């Protein structure tokens, strides 16, 4: 496969996606409006490669070869040479619609436009372009270099060729692709977020402390991480956004975001990335 990848967004997910593309030997350009965010993301990628060297997973030559495949740009026009564009911006419907309109204008005629959305309709995103058959969902899991799954979501108009190419790319990245239908939250977050939301309700109602809730789920249910620690890792703002998509899209009160989650997000307590969520970092 001779793909050239462009990743839109240099945040937690964007830099992780760029990392695995570079590690697989695929040329990748990470694009963000902020030069500062790009510098920070590149430093994170370098640090993660160094950590892999210390663990004996790769050697210095492999790291250097991977980093030679990575470039950065503040110009969205850099997507013009990409065969696959992977959007990894904030989980905001209107923002993604705007980005896909721009990508459709700037990307090459046959380029696949993929989105890392964790909950938003692929069909609706595709409708903002003139190439709906080339739009697809590639939902990576966090942290991207570690997690093996990619949810693949085809929209109503996504072609078989686009699906096949995306599945092949996922495998080339060393991931396991699993196809999900285009419903709010797909599979992963339709199952995960109600559990996280219920854990937040437990804290709000005084059923248990965050530590108690997480310990019960780790030791009692054999989860590697408790739901509240996981929410902090995902980002409480992202959790809230996904729950709102589920609640609006499926119309069931069981997806109603817990008021305490809304309060934390309003306070700027977003989890690890802000230094405080259900835990202090």
Language model: regions and residue ranges:
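NAD(P)+-binding Rossmann beta1-loop-alpha1 motif at the extreme N-terminus of oxidoreductases
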Residues: 1-51, 55
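Rossmann-like NAD(P)-binding element
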Residues: 12, 37-40, 51-112, 120
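Amphipathic alpha-helical segments at domain termini/boundaries
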Residues: 25, 66-84, 165, 169-174, ...
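Rossmann-fold dinucleotide-binding core
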Residues: 112-182, 186-190
């Amino acid at each position: 496969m001779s793909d050239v990848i462009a990743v839109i967004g240099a945040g937690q997910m964007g830099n992780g996606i760029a990392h695995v593309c570079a590690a697989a030997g695929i040329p990748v350009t990470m694009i963000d409006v902020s030069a500062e965010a790009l510098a920070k993301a590149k430093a994170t990628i370098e640090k993660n490669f160094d950590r892999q060297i210390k663990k004996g997973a790769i050697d210095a030559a492999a790291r250097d070869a991977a980093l030679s495949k990575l470039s950065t740009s503040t110009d969205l026009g850099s997507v013009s040479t990409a065969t696959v564009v992977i959007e990894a911006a904030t989980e905001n419907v209107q923002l993604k619609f705007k980005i896909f309109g721009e990508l459709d204008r700037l990307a090459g005629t046959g380029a696949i436009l993929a989105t890392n959305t964790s909950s938003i309709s692929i069909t609706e995103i595709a409708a903002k372009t003139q190439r709906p058959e080339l739009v697809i969902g590639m939902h990576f899991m966090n942290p991207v270099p570690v997690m093996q799954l990619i949810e693949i979501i085809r929209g109503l108009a996504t072609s078989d060729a686009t699906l096949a190419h995306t599945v092949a790319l996922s495998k080339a990245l060393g991931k396991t692709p699993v196809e999900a239908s285009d419903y709010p939250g797909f599979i992963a977050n339709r199952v995960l977020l109600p559990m996280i939301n219920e854990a937040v309700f437990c804290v709000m109602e005084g059923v248990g402390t965050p530590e108690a809730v997480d310990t019960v789920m780790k030791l009692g249910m054999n989860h590697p991480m408790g739901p509240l620690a996981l929410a902090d890792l995902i980002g409480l703002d992202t959790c809230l956004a996904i729950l709102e998509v589920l609640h609006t899209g499926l119309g069931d009160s069981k997806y109603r975001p817990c008021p305490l989650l809304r309060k934390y997000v309003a306070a700027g307590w977003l989890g690890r990335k802000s230094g405080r969520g259900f835990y202090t970092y």
